[in-house]
Amino acid sequence: MITPQQALTRLVEQREIFHDEMLALMRQIMRGELTPVQIAGVITGLRVKKETVGEIAAAAEVMREFALEVPVQQREHLVDTCGTGGDAAHTFNISTTAAFVAAAAGARVAKHGGRSVSSTSGSADVLEALGVNLALTPEQVAASIDAIGIGFMFAPNFHGAMRHAAPVRRELGVRTLFNILGPLTNPANAPHQLLGVFHADLVGILVRVLQRLGSSHVMVVHGSDGMDEITLAGDTLIGELKDGEVSEYTINPREFGLQPCGSDALKVWDATQAKDMLLSVLDDLPGPARDIVLFNAGAAIYVADRAATLGEGIELAREAIRSGAARDKLQQLVAYSTQAKQA
């Protein structure tokens, strides 16, 4: 057992917290055994030192341990499209839109998310605007995924132990370990993942964290314009975990027949605008919004092992939108979640 004081001493000296020690420290935080000052000291110390793969993996293990489990029965092709947020791009909900497209193409989507971090509309905000009921039990979310191929887990409902750290995070107002733990702690434990990150340095780190956590097929992505998505603006840095091996490379929209475009055409200022842009994509309106969803949904389909290549995934995404299947998937989730609320 490591005390908060011992951990702080280690961090001030720029030394790593070992795996078992990090497990113990994180459990103390999750149980409410540390004071707000101690929590602030530890997470700030980790940030200043720079969190290692081992420290992040241990913290994620504990957060998963304390989360409510979503007991999905059919785990093959189960994928999450959750990102860190924090890129301040103010774009519409690309990964949420991509989730419906991927589900329509045969992936099973366990979408994990919350309210806005730095954008004007988080995944929960836009889904609520679309009529999705966020207050489902773990069993109801699992049933949704098994029945219609997609379910949404509103993060605060599944990570109750985070209440001990949440006020500290808000008051500190700077990025800490907890900003990157959310996408690593899917309550359905999805083995496939498309994870967008707010800084290029996190690509190599988080793909190796997911490797340690036992993920199957993962892409961690960061756009050259700073987006925590696969971008149309230029290159995207990719960290891919496949067949137990990690590779890092870049991709560009031109390689896949997509028109390069900056993020201005993707900006929204509230959940209503985000909803309208999401619906325009699902209605197959040509333009940058549809193209960036094709790019990201294609990647989600690929990492869910529903396509052999990213290019094939993009074509499957294109057909899912063109056929109306992606729009149908949204309507199915609205209907299923509303029915569950009334049950």
UniProtKB/Swiss-Prot annotation:
InterPro entries: Anthranilate_Pribosyl_Tfrase, Glycosyl_Trfase_fam3, Glycosyl_Trfase_fam3_N_dom, Glycosyl_Trfase_fam3_N_dom_sf, Nuc_phospho_transferase. Pathway: Amino-acid biosynthesis; L-tryptophan biosynthesis; L-tryptophan from chorismate: step 2/5. GO terms for biological process: L-tryptophan biosynthetic process. One of its GO terms (cellular component) is cytosol. This is Anthranilate phosphoribosyltransferase. Catalyzes the transfer of the phosphoribosyl group of 5-phosphorylribose-1-pyrophosphate (PRPP) to anthranilate to yield N-(5'-phosphoribosyl)-anthranilate (PRA). The gene is trpD. NCBIfam families: trpD. Binds 2 magnesium ions per monomer. It comes from the Bacteria. Anthranilate 1 binds at residue 83. Homodimer. Keywords: Amino-acid biosynthesis, Aromatic amino acid biosynthesis, Glycosyltransferase, Magnesium, Metal-binding, Transferase, Tryptophan biosynthesis. The lineage of its organism: Bacteria, Pseudomonadati, Pseudomonadota, Betaproteobacteria, Nitrosomonadales. Mg(2+) 1 binds at residues 95, 229. One of its GO terms (molecular function) is anthranilate phosphoribosyltransferase activity. Belongs to the anthranilate phosphoribosyltransferase family. It is an enzyme of class 2 (transferase). It catalyses: N-(5-phospho-beta-D-ribosyl)anthranilate + diphosphate = 5-phospho-alpha-D-ribose 1-diphosphate + anthranilate. Gene3D superfamilies: Nucleoside phosphorylase/phosphoribosyltransferase catalytic domain, Transferase, Pyrimidine Nucleoside Phosphorylase, Chain C. SUPFAM superfamilies: Nucleoside phosphorylase/phosphoribosyltransferase catalytic domain (SSF52418), Nucleoside phosphorylase/phosphoribosyltransferase N-terminal domain (SSF47648). Coiled coil: none annotated. It comes from Thiobacillus denitrificans (strain ATCC 25259 / T1). 5-phospho-alpha-D-ribose 1-diphosphate binds at residues 83, 86-87, 91, 93-96, 111-119, 123. Mg(2+) 2 binds at residues 228-229.
